[in-house]
């Protein structure tokens, strides 16, 4: 039995422990005190890989190094602390005393590493970092977030009780009350409170809504707005194309997502209140009612749409039931009951015109942020456009701020831009406010680079003409011009055709200020449309038929006016003859004959018995003149007293010729020729 004990005590590990390296260490201390022998070695760890054995030589070397360092430090004289700024008697700064450099022995309390060294390779390894895993249990780095360890996140249980006595919120509890100024009728006002009152307390405690989280998956074909954002920033187009998927988490684990960096109501940037359920963000003043940024709601905040989805639990039956109850309870506003019900279930949105109104005019368009813009608005150039060579410029960041270029060398005054009437000099603290300014090589008018239209952009290495000048020399073609001018005009026109191909020139047929008599030549426009209705309420060009109808309508009205005047003239003439006949005592038959002679057209029944081709035209109108009418106008009372004698054949021929001549002329010219006043003028 004794031999077995000896064998167990003399194990290989024990024999190794009494190696020469360890014996030298024990021999130095054996003179002072002898080491007692061990009777058993059952609870001793003999794994030498975890031990650090220090020899006697190593102890002596480390001891000498420590004493040598102390001796050197003792010999260094201590310097007196100096002030940071040394000043003379007048108060001027003479010297700046920089603080002493940090010693290599100083360490960071958090990492335990010196300040002059970077992190070690062990810290750089991602395998040693703490990650939060996703739902599937996978450890993809793209879907993980760094989470501190539990020893740093532990909070004492009585932490709130310790600091609760120091709070002073009880002083303002009686002063602050919830405002009812912006309260509106809706599903979240009366319906929710009434339904909660009807629920028993046991069901209310057991009812737990599952956390609804949102995951955004960006499509690969998302387009980015390069004009509004640069260098990979989030844009509205990229996030609007993202497909949202709402799902329920069975394990109650959270999935982090990034909220939008623009307001969902007005599409503008600024400070937001982010929804904890969906990625939407809102300005504090864009919400209905607005929220005070100093008194934000505690806990998780949800937008109106998410609140409504959580309340109805994504059930259409619940939605219809609540909507019907709301309509029954609000009979006084039955017409707008559905509208009032849907007001609180939608997020506030800035008013925008419909697309068919926005796209009516070709020069008007909607900006990147939904604002109004037309051809008069100048789009500012971005940094990528300014500092690249796409527009023939070679600008660098070093040229972005140079105060000398903003001052006129001759007068010493600031150069003021012709377009914006500003200098935009910038400052040393804010050089980004500076804008490059240049002067015209012909009129010395200053222009900012971003104020110049793109059609007149300056190219380095050549003289530049500002937009105030005409682009080319135009020769006016005059009819009565010399040969050299006409040749110059032809040469200029030929050069223009050579320089710019496929360019059409339209020469007007009439000059400016030409007075025409209403004879306007209109080129008909043919439209190849297969449908008659107007799509999207677009404004079309003026149709050719509308001009024709207006022209015919004006002619018809003018003809009616002429007929009305002629009728009034004849009516006044007949009235005058009737009055003269009644004064002279003529019978009614004579008066009828006198009046019949004044009719301009008379039905001729002479051709009824004729057998020629014109026999069918029995009721032809023929212009007749009666000299009795003229004599009655000239001498109204002497017509009956005239005695008619027999005339010879020659006199009758002359009278017939005279009658033909008189009948060939109209009445107005004949009365004017005979110097007889018009009866119409006499009536007036």
UniProtKB/Swiss-Prot annotation:
One of its GO terms (molecular function) is zinc ion binding. A zinc finger (PHD-type) spans 260-309, 414-472. The modification Phosphoserine is found at residues 68, 683. Residues 1-48 are annotated as: Disordered. GO terms for biological process: negative regulation of antisense RNA transcription; negative regulation of transcription by RNA polymerase II; nucleosome assembly; positive regulation of transcription by RNA polymerase II; regulation of DNA-templated DNA replication initiation; regulation of transcription by RNA polymerase II; transcription elongation by RNA polymerase II. One of its GO terms (cellular component) is nucleus. The keyword RNA-binding does not apply. The keyword DNA repair does not apply. Gene3D superfamilies: Zinc/RING finger domain, C3HC4 (zinc finger) (3.30.40.10). The modification N-acetylmethionine is found at residue 1. It comes from the Eukaryota. InterPro entries: Chromatin_regulatory_protein, Zinc_finger_PHD-type_CS, Znf_FYVE_PHD, Znf_PHD, Znf_PHD-finger, Znf_RING/FYVE/PHD. Keywords: Acetylation, Chromatin regulator, Metal-binding, Nucleus, Phosphoprotein, Repeat, Repressor, Transcription, Transcription regulation, Zinc, Zinc-finger. Coiled coil: none annotated. Pfam families: PHD (PF00628). It is found in: Nucleus. Residues 10-29 have a biased composition (Low complexity). SMART domains: PHD. Component of the RPD3C(S) complex composed of at least EAF3, RCO1, RPD3, SIN3, and UME1. Present with 486 molecules/cell in log phase SD medium. Catalytic component of the RPD3C(S) histone deacetylase complex responsible for the deacetylation of lysine residues on the N-terminal part of the core histones (H2A, H2B, H3 and H4). Histone deacetylation gives a tag for epigenetic repression and plays an important role in transcriptional regulation, cell cycle progression, DNA damage response, osmotic stress response and developmental events. This is Transcriptional regulatory protein RCO1. It comes from Saccharomyces cerevisiae (strain ATCC 204508 / S288c). The gene is RCO1.
